[in-house]
Amino acid sequence: MTTVTPLVEGGDFPLKAVVGEQIPLSAKVFREGHDAVNANVVLTDPAGGEHVVPLTRTNEGLSLWETTIVADREGDWTYRVEGWSDPYGTWEHDATIKVEAGVDVDLMLEEGARVLERALNQERPESAQRLLRDAIAALRDEDRPPAARLAAGTAPEVVREFAQRPLREHVSPSPDYPWLVERQRALYGAWYEFFPRSEGCYYDEATGEWVTGTLRTAAKRLPAVADMGFDVIYLTPIHPIGTINRKGPNNTLNAGPKDPGSPYAIGSKDGGHDAIEPTLGTFEDFDFFVAEAERLGLEVAMDIALQCAPDHPWVTSHPEWFTTRADGTIAYAENPPKKYQDIYPLNFDNDPAGIYAEMRRMVQVWIDHGVKIFRVDNPHTKPVEFWQWLITDVAQTHPDVIWLAEAFTKPAMMATLAKVGFQQSYTYYAWRNERWELEEYMEELSTQTADYMRPSFWPTTHDILTPYMQYGGPAAWKVRAALAATLVPTYGIYTGYELLESVPRPGVEEQIDNEKYEFKNRRWEDYAPGGPKEGQLWMADYLRTLNEIRAAHPALHWLRNWRKQSANDENVMCFSKRHVDGGRDDTIIVVANLDPHTTRETWIHLDMPELGLGWNDGFVAKDLITGESWQWGQHNFVRVGRDAEPVHIIHVRRF
């Protein structure tokens, strides 16, 4: 027995899944000679109970055996594949041939009786024992014709009994490989990001100064977020902001006395990572925010940025946690050509034990206040072994905590962060705009890396505004949101997406007047109730529709079920997702025009078996965006673009 898949680094890291996720498993099973072989996988649940799942041979020439495994509870599981010699299968195969040919008839029938007698020595229900005893008697009944005797030993009920409780010889087990099963939010969810200080802020004309939003005013925005159908509210850092080298608007070096600074420059005389920026409120206010989110069905995700402003308390209490340059000054953060004079990066080399302990204490502070999801800023700039230790240690007492890696870096580092514990990862989605790029990327994410990495797709963030979004207009913003919401189970939206905030800061791929450095009053009161005023762009309704579609269709809750479909036009992408669970068969087809400037007319060609249909079958194609329906088959004409909806999200309704 060889080539067990899935297997993460030979079993050094766990296979990842969530409860109910269907994991395809395979192995190559063979032996010398011509005797029959068989295989099963033994799943050991967190309580130590064993569950045996048979494998099915799917390619005899390649000795390939396959099955699907599913876990019904969270926790640390293991899986072990066992290949074994199958005495009953060997006898059934040989006897069928020889008895029909009249070769060694009595000998073969007696050997069959003896195989069944060996099976009687195993623990079996009385009904099964009676079945086997009757078959043994028939095999040895010389008054019957040989064919009838053989039929008794190979009857369907006998075959089923050996399939359920096989007679196994020469069992060859694999090691017990680790399998981590987590809650569904580790794979599936819709995120919404905002800066709390902007929610409820306003410009005071009387004083000429901005008045900050607070955690209490930010909580007033939560009903709108929940109404759009999001599952997670993600807060940028809420800690005290440093005053030394504070950045001004658009990342300028000289902040005014009233400029709020970047929340990623963490720490001041008011505290560090375990404190709250006083202008935002108190821990009582934070607890209120979390409680309000929970009341509305939202989970709170908190940003962890392990870096410090020059006036962070750690700078004076633990100078060894930072890098000292030759002139005696502490090195600020750089990513040439970018410079971050308001941030000191941590150096884990000098006192790793001290830093580890403090980070663990800090994380626990927020867990104790109801946070179960952490979005980690730039984890690839910290030691991998630190994250492995921290995530593992937290999981010992809080296994429901989820970690999202904001690591736009090399694939090897992204993969390693996922293997050591991060449940989710940001991706290159924002920069994958061509059809071939998206299809190639999805082939990778849904197969090669799906055993350990769960992608999160974001069309924009507070750091990212690609040229496609800058110049694509409303069609581009619809397409990128719809693709993010349907390609993968987890996606995120940065606040302001509803307003199509597409103006960039010259020379960089981020918004002008970036919210990282200033307040932004979006005047939500102008849009509700009753929607936008005439002439105003508004995408909240579209986002709500996407999230309603996601919630209603289990096919969109999973990653491994993505399948590429075909379209004649290279600017039109077509794919499908299908999920079968019990009696429900849910199938979705997505057709998207990737050219936001032109309406495209083309033909799509569907792999009907991937949809659970025959090649000549027809079905009702219900567009979940517009409510329209069409009669579709294998080949279908579509029209998508700026003069029509740029994306079809089709529910397959079988006749």
What are the residue ranges of the model-derived segments?
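Hydrophobic faces of well-ordered beta-strands that scaffold small-molecule active sites
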Residues: 190-192, 233-235, 300-302, 374, ...
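Aromatic- and acidic-residue-enriched carbohydrate-binding clefts of CAZyme catalytic domains
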Residues: 188-213, 241-289, 316-353, 512-523
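Catalytic-core region of carbohydrate-active enzymes that cleave or remodel glycosidic bonds
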Residues: 391-406, 411, 431-507, 581, ...
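Active-site neighborhood of glycoside hydrolase catalytic domains
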Residues: 324, 347-414
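Substrate-binding cleft/loops of secretory-pathway carbohydrate-active enzymes
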Residues: 309-320, 387, 395-396, 408-436, ...
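Carbohydrate-interacting/catalytic domains
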Residues: 1-196, 201, 205-231, 293, ...
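Short, acidic/polar
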Residues: 213-224, 351-366, 476-481
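Carboxylate/His-rich catalytic cores and anion/metal-binding grooves
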Residues: 226-250, 302, 307-322
